Amino acid sequence: MRRIWNNLTSILLLPALFTCICLISCSQDTTTENQRSAYYWSTTWQMDSSKMNFIQKHHIKRLYVRFFDVVRDADGEIMPNATLQFDTTDENMTVEEKEKESLMPKGMEIIPVVYIVNDCFKANTKTNPISSDKSGRKSSDETPRQLADKILNRILQMNEANDIENVKEIQIDCDWTASTKDAYFEFLHILKEKAKDKKIQLSATIRLHQLSMTPPPVDRGILMMYNTGDVKQLSCQKPILDMKDVAPYIQHLGNYPLPLSAAYPLFSWRVLFREGKFVGIMHADDDFPVLPSDSIVVRKPEMSDIMEAVRSINYQNEDINREVILFDLNTDNIKRFKSEDYEKIFNHRSDGSSI
């Protein structure tokens, strides 16, 4: 397992790509502006001209970049998976980009994100359960401390291998529940202290159902304003974002003890149903065999849904929208709406003007 965690030969990306990212030379004075950010959630880094233009046009200065997942393999071992790979071809670059040797605008802040499957924190798996360091465990069990060490070291190694400098924050994404809270929180506490030694802050995603529970021991949270309904139900028309589902969870945001930012959805799903029953989400046409009698439905948030969510968050706690994050920076997602619509999201106003 150590070889897999430490083997970075397959993830040596283009050092020159991130060298330009880390050059701190902003052309605009953004001291009085709210933070504009986006997630980059993919297994392949492809910063083509359309994404670059979107970033520059909307003055996005921070990217939350998914580095890798952490999952259990078939033997129950906790392992890294789906590590971010860069597209090393030149076909996505314009002549100007090649000449400038720049795939990103200057001044971009990168926040590495690691997604951890909740099963990694369940203690009742057949092998290698992760459990509290204080619990009675076998000597071969994975512990929160060991996992924190491995994840932080892997992030730091990826940063170094790809010339990603000046990283001030890392983020953990996990759909934790009451049954995994203790192990997950202990892991976060340890990781926070280890990151602090490197002068790095720790943030974590916060799902709506987690708002009613004790906040995780991190420096700040990102409230995920999406995946609010049951995509497996054909009758659920708005599984990505429906304020009827959101409203009960956000009533007490003003008293939430952890500093928050909010992430809003741009993505859509193509969902396959067979005889009214959920088959899966189709990310590609060949993900599932499609029968003539099957139904493929498209689920996506409309601009009105997103703006209702933005206004609702403003009403509950306007400080949350001091940083607006789009999920995610995908070529299709950034073409869904007009340019002025994205400005409305960032500016928190339906008329597109700044607050």
Regions found by a protein language model. Give the residues of each.
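Bacterial N-terminal signal peptides that target proteins for export
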Residues: 2-13
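Bacterial N-terminal signal peptides
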Residues: 11-22
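Boundary/entry segment of secreted carbohydrate-active catalytic domains
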Residues: 26-55, 60, 66
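Chitinase-like catalytic core of GlcNAc-active glycosidases
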Residues: 31-33, 37-40, 69-71, 75-223
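Short, acidic/polar
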Residues: 44-56, 144-161, 210, 305-314
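Conserved, mostly hydrophobic/aromatic
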Residues: 63, 172, 221, 262, ...
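Substrate-binding surface in catalytic domains of secreted glycosidases
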Residues: 186-274
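Substrate-binding cleft of secreted/luminal carbohydrate-active enzymes
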Residues: 267-269, 275-355
